[in-house]
Amino acid sequence: MTMQTDILTGRSAIGPALWRVRVLIGLVALHFLGVYTACLLLGHPFGSGTASTLISLLQVQIPLFLVILLFWRFGWMIVKIRPKRPTAWFANDLRETLLDRDRILTGIFAFLAMCLFAGSFTVGKDLIPLINPFSWDPTFAWLDRALHGGTDPWVLLYKITGTPAITTAINAAYHLWLMLAYFLIFVACFNVSRHDKHRRYLVADVLCWVIGGNILATLFASVGPVYYEAFGYGADFVPLMDTLRGFSEISPVWALDLQDMLLDGYLNDGPMRGISAMPSMHVASTVTMTLYAFSVSRAYGWIMTGFAALILMGSVQLGWHYAIDGYLSIALSLCCWALARRLLRAFA
């Protein structure tokens, strides 16, 4: 009888859990159908090697996230709670979290939705040159110079940050971005049932990637300074790339290997071939993370503001993007953050 009751209770909890993330699931489902339809129309297989790589990286990092959260909660207990019996309090807190059926179920559904979205997004990104061949780079390069007094932004930036050590540090922050993005998504998913700010972050993040990483990236198809010469636009950014290669002989510049891998994948139809510059999704997603951080704590928000500034610098410093890519991305993120709030209120 007890087992039967548990099963019925579990089933009754599934409906409310799905309902809490209905906006997120709806957006992901619409995006999935849109990309799948595009694949059918273009005769392109619905699959991407990038998606499997991203999911594999996430699987490896989940145990680390759990350890980080355990240490964070323990530190919170020591600094803020200060119970008379720390061990008993911590054990009880952990037990309550693990037995919170609504929280766990809602988190699982949200997390699965985000994983599905990662897959369909990367497929959509691979479709960009099939729908709209890359052509906007000369325009964006010209706009960059026009906005910065006739000089390429990377030249201005390198007057301040143009050393091998600083470039390595910025590159490290740029690579840390993926782990941080995964971590915040994981945290938000398993806190959705506790506060709307977590739900808002997930919805805003999906909107940002769909509108920016798929729709705008297709409309303004571009490859970025790093591939400017390879795609036949001229040697304008050869000095930038030569400088980075020179730096790499003194201090690591890991971006160069990834850039070569993506170009090789694009030219030879490899598993990793998602090239796209406008807008910068590194910048857009980091600004969204920053807005989320501010909704949790002003201190977290200012820390993330500094990180967002590093990502914006890195997008130009490492040759991935034109400065204008980042500027548009900031505006995009702010708009998606506001739109997420409206959507959640509309379907409240």
Task: Identify what each model region corresponds to.
Residues 94-173:
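Intramembrane catalytic core of multi-pass membrane enzymes that act on lipidic substrates
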Residues 53-68, 109-110, 171-175:
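Alpha-helical transmembrane segments of polytopic membrane proteins
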Residues 31-39, 209-215, 308-317:
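Aromatic-anchored segments of alpha-helical transmembrane domains
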Residues 107-111, 186-220, 226-240:
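Interfacial segments of alpha-helical transmembrane regions
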Residues 36-49:
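Juxtamembrane "helix-exit" motif on the non-cytosolic side of transmembrane helices
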Residues 2-18, 80-104, 348:
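Membrane-interfacial, low-structure loops and terminal tails that flank and connect transmembrane helices
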Residues 260-348:
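Membrane-embedded catalytic cores of phosphoryl/pyrophosphoryl-handling enzymes
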Residues 218-295:
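Membrane-interfacial catalytic/cofactor-binding modules of polytopic membrane enzymes
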